[in-house]
Design a protein with these regions (language model features):
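Positively charged n-region of N-terminal signal peptides that target proteins for export
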Residues: 1-4
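Hydrophobic membrane-insertion alpha-helices, especially the h-region
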Residues: 8-19
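Hydrophobic single-pass membrane-insertion segments
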Residues: 19-31
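Short, low-complexity N-terminal intrinsically disordered segments enriched in polar/charged residues
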Residues: 30-62, 66, 74, 78, ...
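A mature extracytoplasmic/lumenal domain signature
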Residues: 76-80, 86-88, 119, 177-179, ...
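Surface-exposed acidic loop/strand-edge motifs in secreted or periplasmic proteins
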Residues: 79-149
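Short beta-strand edge/turn micro-motifs at domain boundaries
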Residues: 131, 135, 140-215
Length: 215
């Protein structure tokens, strides 16, 4: 798949994302990981890839919203798994990586993992998978995110944004709340960046990068 020459920023309402989710989740229950993408002759290949990427990303956010980890696991890369980053800066050697089966059985996993270090405090983040997902994955309803960027980071703060360097062979979708309460003047922004590897006609989830305002 060819990467678009110019990053594309899309402003997508929650209603439109809902429509994308309804289309994406029509893949067969027994399908292999990731949604199967049908090739079309028109529009251009890059446009088709962007559309299919958004459909897959919307399906992933919908599965997260519903805590449907069995469906979520069908999008995880079968050999690379999926890596979780709590604060914008990706560190593949340190960040936790999980397999398809681990994601599928997420709700029953009571083990405590070290996910990184808390911003401002420096204490290690010790959480179960369910606890981490509630705090550093779906900390807002990203199915209703007011801004969505394709291969474009919408909002950033003090943390180093190195997603494209960490995943040079991938594409990503940024679901972002630039501000959740106008009174906070943007200091409460948060985002969920889903990183996908394209292989033939499929998009596979390989990274989940959470972002928020940091000290």
């Amino acid at each position: 798949m060819k990467r678009a020459a110019i990053p594309l920023i899309l402003l997508v309402s929650g209603f439109v994302l809902g429509l994308l989710c309804s289309v994406s989740l029509r893949h067969p229950a027994a399908a292999t990981p990731a949604a199967v993408i049908q090739k079309e002759e028109t529009p251009s290949e890059s446009a088709v890839n962007t559309t299919s990427l958004l459909h897959t990303a919307a399906a992933v956010t919908n599965a997260l919203h519903d805590q449907d980890y069995e469906t979520l696991s069908t999008y995880v890369h079968p050999t690379r798994g999926v890596t979780f980053t709590p604060y914008s800066t990706v560190a593949l050697q340190r960040d936790q990586n999980f397999t398809v089966d681990q994601i599928k059985n997420l709700s029953s996993d009571t083990s405590t993992y070290t996910w990184g270090y808390e911003d401002g405090r420096g204490e290690s983040i010790q959480m179960t998978m369910s606890e981490y997902f509630a705090r550093f994955v779906f900390d807002a309803d990203y199915t209703q995110a007011p801004k969505v960027g394709v291969d474009q980071i919408i909002t950033s703060g003090n943390a180093l944004e190195n997603l494209t360097e960490a995943y040079p062979d991938c594409h990503f979708v940024d679901f972002c709340y630039p501000s959740r309460d106008p009174a906070n003047e943007g200091l409460d922004w948060c985002s969920l960046k889903l990183v996908f590897l394209g292989e033939k006609t499929s998009w596979y989830l390989v990274g989940v990068v959470h972002g928020e305002w940091t000290i």
